[in-house]
């Protein structure tokens, strides 16, 4: 029998696959509806997420919630939110390749358990690691990509933290969200 959510939570809680376990306060597995049809994947926990053990709880999380609400979704209601990394990189630096390699199997297991109908990758780090590309986020926007053996549709948009720094790109993110919503509607 394949391990389920409880086994995954326990494995992440005791994980020592990379050095980030030494500096984290709490690992951040994910949050939301475990029968969700939408999976939102970000980069890594920040300081507030590390303290609370939940992804997207700071200002970027508030913006993500507003973005989801704009397309008729809500955290915890048909939405599950996770990150590439389950532990916070010091100083919120980009994840190192070895850290991603250590953590990605956990996300892949989450995806197996969830079996989402659509994945929304927010930010360059999530997009590049889920799609195995070094392309820019701008080049990958506006297309339906496929993830994994189940060929789950994957849409790319900007990370909410980036949008807080560059609000002029919110219009592009809105276009991405409307595109994701229309792709999802066609899956029904």
Predicted regions and their residues:
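A polyanion-binding, active-site-adjacent surface
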Residues: 1-188
């Amino acid at each position: 029998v394949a391990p389920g959510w409880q086994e995954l939570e326990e494995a992440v809680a005791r994980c020592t696959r990379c050095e980030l376990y030494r500096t984290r306060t709490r690992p951040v597995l994910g949050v939301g509806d475990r029968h969700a049809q939408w999976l939102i994947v970000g980069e890594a926990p920040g300081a507030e997420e590390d303290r609370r053990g939940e992804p997207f709880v700071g200002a970027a999380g508030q913006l993500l919630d507003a973005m989801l609400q704009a397309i008729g979704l809500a955290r915890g209601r048909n939405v599950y939110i996770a990150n590439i990394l389950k532990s916070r990189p010091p100083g919120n630096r980009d994840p190192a390749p070895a850290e991603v390699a250590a953590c990605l199997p956990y996300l892949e297991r989450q995806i197996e358990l969830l079996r989402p109908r659509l994945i929304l990758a927010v930010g360059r780090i999530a997009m590049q690691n889920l799609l195995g590309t070094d392309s820019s986020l701008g080049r990958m926007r506006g297309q339906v990509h496929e993830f994994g053996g189940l060929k789950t549709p994957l849409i790319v948009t900007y990370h909410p933290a980036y949008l807080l720094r560059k609000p002029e790109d919110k219009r592009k993110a809105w276009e991405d969200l409307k595109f994701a919503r229309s792709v999802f509607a066609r899956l029904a």
